[in-house]
Amino acid sequence: MHFYIPPPPISGFWLGPLYVHMYSVFMLAGALVLFELTNRRFIVLTGNREFTAFAVTSLLIPVILGARLWHVVSHTQMYEHQPFYKVFAIWQGGLGFIGGVFSGLICFFVIAKIKKVPPFTFLDALAPGILVALCFARLGNYFNGEVFGTETTLPWGLKLSHEGFKDLNVEKYFHPIFLYEIILNVFIIVILLVLEKRVFVKTVFPKGSVFAAFLVLYGLGRFALEPMRYNLQQNSFGLDLNYVGAAAMIIVGVLIACRHTIASGKLRNSGD
């Protein structure tokens, strides 16, 4: 007998005249958990009780736009022959996490400067919450029939429904990449909390080290998972942007972790 992960039983439900997608339910739940975790952590670190709400509400639209843009650019062939409004149909899925990270990061530094808040302290408070929210989002991907991999004979393979997968042999089983990434995210959260409690507080590490570790570890994890991921559509550039994005996350993480060393080196050079 072959055990497998069944197709999602539903994709949404009716709430009066409104059809609510399960994807949006999990996205909303993830956003609420992210806010609560980040707010509590930032209050402990700084005593500031107002900034988290301001930051989350201010960054919501830039993050969604960046995530959607990343998805569309990564899958241009999917939208070439579709009505233009499909580009904006985020309720059907299609948000690129990596794009959301970078668009949010850029906008965050702007508002942190305006509000005169220590940016890297907030990013340290934010990092675990991002991963928890992403776990919720990946559950939403399951209900949307997204983020699965290539065919597999492993006993935890994902069974796809017949709807929406005409180009695939739905009698086969596929790697549940969404589940792999949930496990990866939980693993990274544990590492971040251990580093924060047992390493970063006992040694001289700059603020932002937790966030830097998140970027590096997640980037490495995406590199490991990406070869198993099934891409229904490719972009028109012949380039897998997820590899580029994962590499960029690693590089930015290393730069954040090493910024004090880089800055001190510049100061020494300027004095020569």
Swiss-Prot record:
E.C. number(s) listed in UniProt: 2.5.1.145
Keyword Transmembrane helix set for record: yes
Any GO molecular function: phosphatidylglycerol-prolipoprotein diacylglyceryl transferase activity
Gene Ontology BP terms: lipoprotein biosynthetic process
Cell compartments where the protein resides: Cell membrane
Pathway: Protein modification; lipoprotein biosynthesis (diacylglyceryl transfer)
Classification via Pfam families: LGT
Residues annotated to bind a 1,2-diacyl-sn-glycero-3-phospho-(1'-sn-glycerol): R138
Coiled-coil residues: none
UniProt keyword annotation of RNA-binding present: no
Broad class of enzyme this protein falls into: transferase
Topological category with respect to the lipid bilayer: Multi-pass membrane protein
A GO-annotated cellular component: plasma membrane
Keywords: Cell membrane, Membrane, Transferase, Transmembrane, Transmembrane helix
Signal peptide span: none
TM ranges: 15-35, 53-73, 94-114, 117-137, 174-194, 199-219, 237-257
Function (record text): Catalyzes the transfer of the diacylglyceryl group from phosphatidylglycerol to the sulfhydryl group of the N-terminal cysteine of a prolipoprotein, the first step in the formation of mature lipoproteins.
Family of the protein in this entry: Belongs to the Lgt family.
NCBIfam families xref list: lgt (TIGR00544)
Name this polypeptide is given: Phosphatidylglycerol--prolipoprotein diacylglyceryl transferase
Source organism of this protein record: Tropheryma whipplei (strain TW08/27) (Whipple's bacillus)
